[in-house]
């Protein structure tokens, strides 16, 4: 895969998450947008590592998209269930779909970002900002 295809995939996932996902009461922004903003703030407080942070943003977008896609009947997760080490069978969900999606997105984002920024120089501030969502 060339570098332009990777950039296209990242921005495609970013747009899907931020433009299609319905807004919630977090200042009129979607939960995905709120997590992206918190991630960008964590990057600003961390060491300057552009490649690492580009990967962090991509993985965050994939994790949030997959969490959203689990509860959507027509969407296919980007990563989960598509590699040998990560088997997944989609289940039919009965219940409040939007709140389940918000919870799943937040759980995925929190776990990923908490792990990725656990060695950050401002870890206390960073984790506190994650906890605020």
Predicted regions and their residues:
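Bacterial N-terminal signal peptides that target proteins for export
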Residues: 1-11
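Bacterial N-terminal signal peptides
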Residues: 9-20
């Amino acid at each position: 895969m060339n570098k332009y295809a990777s950039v296209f995939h990242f921005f495609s996932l970013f747009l899907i998450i931020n433009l299609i996902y319905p807004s919630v009461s977090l200042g009129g922004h979607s939960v995905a947008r709120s997590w992206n903003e918190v991630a960008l703030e964590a990057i600003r407080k961390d060491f300057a590592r552009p490649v690492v942070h580009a990967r962090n943003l991509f993985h965050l977008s994939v994790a949030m998209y997959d969490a959203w896609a689990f509860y959507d009947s027509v969407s296919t997760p980007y990563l989960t269930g598509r590699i040998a080490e990560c088997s997944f069978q989609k289940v039919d969900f009965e219940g409040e779909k939007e709140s389940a999606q918000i919870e799943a997105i937040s759980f995925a984002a929190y776990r990923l970002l908490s792990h990725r920024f656990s060695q950050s120089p401002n870890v206390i501030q960073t984790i506190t900002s994650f906890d605020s969502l």
